[in-house]
Amino acid sequence: MNLPPLPARRTLLTTGAAAILTGVTATACSGTSDGSTGPSDASGTSGGTDASPAPPTPSKTAPTGPADFSALAKSLDGSLVRPQDASYPTARQLYNTRFDGLKPAAVAYVRHEADIRECLAFARRTGTPVSIRSGGHSYAGWSSGNGHLVLDVSSLSRVGSGGTIGAGAKLIDVYQGLARNGLTIPGGSCPTVGISGLTLGGGHGVASRAYGLTCDSLTAATLVTADGKTLTVDAENHPDLFWALRGAGNGNFGVVTELTFRTRPVPQTVTAYMSWPWSRARSVVSAWQEWGPAQPDEIWSSAHLAAGPGGGNPTVSVAAFSLGTYGDLQNAVDLLADRIGAPASSVSLRRRSYQESMLVYAGCSGITDAQCHLPGTTPGRTTQGTLQRETYAAASDFYDRSLSPAGVQALLDRTEAFARIPVTASGGGGSIALTALGGAINRVSPQSTAFVHRGSRVLAQYIASWTPGTAGAAQQDWLKNTHAAMRRHASGAAYQNYTNPALTDWRRAYYGSAADRLADLKKRYDPERLFAFPQAL
């Protein structure tokens, strides 16, 4: 839409700058968070810094018969893809190319709960390890595994007008499906992430400060447990399991098939993007960390530090999203510029529909819904898909307090360190994304759900990417050293949707005070540990 003429402002608003925002978010699946740019698997787990996943924790279930996959295939309504099948090279892929070496025994594209029961019975009977997958965005590769039976729920993708959504629905389809009825839910921005993994691990997004996490809008869930029972859980039925699924549900208690959400009318939005020269980076980070978490609930923001290899200057930018008025966000970013002490060198401020904003953050502005998918013919993909997979690793921290000057300097030093990686060393990029928390997120009691991170000011994600097919050793070393450098400035907690295999005390980092209760529930609902992976409860 055309904007009215604007007076000169301290943020130096420019026309036609929307392309800047689109370009910055074009890699929406390996950016700041599962809300603005971060991936989360859809029914498994996600996160990590190691180049390859740890070996899976074996199930306690003893095999009682041979693994006859041909018989399993005949018992399913959905398709079972084996290594000899033409679709296997695509079926075995996760979103992150660093796990392309994983070779599951079979991928079952389940069509309903009966298919899931057949697969779980087969796994119990034969001792075949199980992985659960929807979006396939697991940072640790734990939605697949060598010799595993992968239960892919992508076919369970119905988006109902009343807010009931199949566990395998991709976020692009969730937003577009709900928008047809004038509705939405708070969620992430990576279009190919599955709704269930986002929700079951919490679910940060650009509307989270206004509406809460994705899991905070969940009102019911249906799942098939390890013994083949179908349970529908909510505040009245199996309330303990309903509590656990909101923050610790990824791959721990069963195969989720359906989620029901409290929906909201689709709002109008305003987006902003501002960048400064790297010489202003200290002032930008120092000012933003006080400004971002203190804004009204309707204003979300993130600060982003990024560098490429080869000695070039890093970049520093701030993105903001508001459910309020254009003028309110304009005034807010002017106050940020005042705190920084310098106008931004480039700015975009624009009114958008909520649906348009989600497409922009997804990197799908200007393309069709069908194109906003991975290409292919297997469930969850489209033949018109134009999105590409990525190669990266990540780690996270929660900051409960503003960073000290030493903490801010550590962020800048680590960003500059990536620029010293030679261009010839697998390329890629390094980034540090800081997302403002507070608002509706922090008004939920830490005891109300299994997502206990309700008192932090900032979620930090450190991301390293490299050229597909290369080792990325220098990039992963940078990531490890960056996470270590920020440890003393952080709370010790980590975001469970950014699963990190390198964490030793992951139970405390992900689940804090909820860890013991969750462990007891795991024993009750999965006593034989059919659902097992290195960081299973």
Language-model regions: role of each:
Residues 2-537:
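Soluble FAD-dependent oxygen oxidases
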